[in-house]
């Protein structure tokens, strides 16, 4: 389970150190990285990534939008080995798409981690905090209530 925030910097070789508290969730020293829906990078343990990949594969290839979605998702995905110092090397195209050049904010999202350019995340967080009450009210209306 991934929770909380932390900020790390890319080193001179473009590597980033995973937060200590999260390293154990990545079995076999493997992490899967892909582009997120909001201009960020998402990191998944192998089991969570495989579940998501299976959902994508269930989409019919007879639909052009499904093919394009699968094409983007799988072409932007990378299997990355975690080195002995807990670092990963993200691809330059993935870093460029997310606008990450130095400071990286790690955001725990329960099943995965989002990576954001820190300045971009700070702007997003400020807006989200301002709208938190409205966001929660609208989202929680969709959740069935236990009685």
Per-segment meaning from a language model:
Residues 1-8, 12-13, 22-80, 84, ...:
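Flexible "stalk/tail and boundary" regions
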